[in-house]
């Protein structure tokens, strides 16, 4: 059939969780308002980046039992990280290449740097303990044993037919399985 078989447990193929996906037709075409939607204007101004960060909050919750405060802090760190890469709500993501996006180790290094430089004398929206918990919770995914599934640039070539091999996922822990499936489904949604 001329398709490609991708064994996601091999670590050979990567879907970068931090590469924003298009979650709707409107977000696929940038920062457009849905004129037929009768919801408040604020809710109609959805960007691809803001939708993706909302997805990432669920993605990280699937991976670990993060508290609401930890998820909110991860969101702040993601905004800082994307800003460091010159990415914001006004960025035309269709003009960016895979190499233009941060990877998971970039997120970890940012959170770790914030943790190491934390100054209790200053006011913060988050605590030193929250940063420490995030570092501990993300370490395996970003730098440790499970980083081979999440830390890298998307390297799946576009093809007419892609078959994702997920059989090996059944032999892994529930959180890793759920997070990998979540990542695969986000990629598939973006390709439609």
Role assignments for model-derived ranges:
Residues 1-10, 18-192:
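P-loop NTPase motor domains
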